[in-house]
Amino acid sequence: MKASGTLREYKVVGRCLPTPKCHTPPLYRMRIFAPNHVVAKSRFWYFVSQLKKMKKSSGEIVYCGQVFEKSPLRVKNFGIWLRYDSRSGTHNMYREYRDLTTAGAVTQCYRDMGARHRARAHSIQIMKVEEIAASKCRRPAVKQFHDSKIKFPLPHRVLRRQHKPRFTTKRPNTFF
């Protein structure tokens, strides 16, 4: 999978094709994060074939639809449990992100894993994504924003204007 652009959350439901032995095969549902519905269906078959004796040729997708965030204007903390294949083996990991949407947090996770661990999107498997309360957060990078009186410093910028002289009679004002 290529994690291009912002990923979307899909709910994919599939099952085996009905046979004379089993008239109503059980349905399997998955939350898949993918750039589009075609990739979401493909990932569903990839994961389901690992878990159950099921293949695309002997199964069908019953439903595939995008899941939209309930409150996309509220900043939330997300905990993401994942496994990924590195050059030395397979690792489990728990990560925390702050974002407006679940899909945004997962996209952030894919970018972060690529930057910090050189993990490509195809080698990352998201196992669970959960919205977590501020009191349950563990990572200091997320906890630092849980202050109600948070302040951000104004940068001390020195503007270099191109067509102004380098030396002048008055001091520059760099406090904005």
Swiss-Prot record:
**What InterPro entries does the database record attribute to this sequence?**
Ribosomal_eL20, Ribosomal_eL20_dom, Ribosomal_eL20_eukaryotes
Q: Which Pfam families match?
A: Ribosomal_L18A
The cross-link Glycyl lysine isopeptide (Lys-Gly) (interchain with G-Cter in SUMO2) sits at 11, 128, 170
Q: N6-succinyllysine (modified residue): where?
A: 76
Where Phosphoserine occurs, the residues are 71, 123
What does the sequence similarity comment in the record state about its family? Belongs to the eukaryotic ribosomal protein eL20 family.
Q: What is the protein name given in its UniProt record?
A: Large ribosomal subunit protein eL20
Q: Which organism is it from?
A: Homo sapiens (Human)
* Gene that encodes it: RPL18A
